[in-house]
Amino acid sequence: MEAEGSAQNSLASLRKAAEAKVYGAEFDVQMTADGIVVVNHDNTIGSTAISRATYEQIKDSKLKNGETLPTLQAYLEEGRKLKDLQLILEIKKNKNKEHEDQAVKTIVKMVKDMGMEKQTEYISFSLNVCEQLVKATGGASEIFYINGDLSPQEAKAKGFTGIDYNFKVFDQHPEWVEEAHRCGLKVN
C-alpha cells in the first residue's frame, strides 16, 4: 500500500506506517559490491545490478517520491525513533551464496550494534539467507521463511520461528497452518 507522498521502501512510507499504527513495516534490502546495504525492492536500479555496483554508483538514485535511495543505516535510524513499529527486514535473494552470506553478517551486525534486535524481524525467500540468519543471531531473532517449499516441520527443524507463505501455498496445504502452530511456529 502506498500512501500519498511516500514510495515503496522510503523513509516517508516508514513514518506513514507508524502513523497508521500498524504492527510493522516490511522493507527490502540489497548489498552493493562494496558491502553497503541499501533499501530497495528490485535487484536493479535502472539497468544497474545493485550487487555489482558500488555504493558511489547508485547513492544518488531517487525514489518515486523524490527521496534519495536510503541505506539500511538511515532506515534503521529512522525506525529506531518509531518504537511501536516492528521492522520487517527482507533480505533479498542473490545468485551468489557468498554475497548472501556477507549480506547477512553485515545486516545482523548493524541491527545488533544499533540495539534493534527486538524491533527487527527477518524474512527471506532464500533458504541460505534464513539458515545464515539462524547462525548469525544464535536463533534469538524472529526469522520467517517465505518461499513456501518447506513443511512447517522442516522450517522448525532449521531453526526458523515462522513461515510467511503466499496464500496459494496454504490453499495447496491447508493443514500447514495448524501444523505450524503445533510446532510453535508463527504464521503470517
Identify the residue ranges that each predicted region occupies.
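Phosphate-group recognition and catalysis centered on beta-loop-alpha active-site segments
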Residues: 1-188
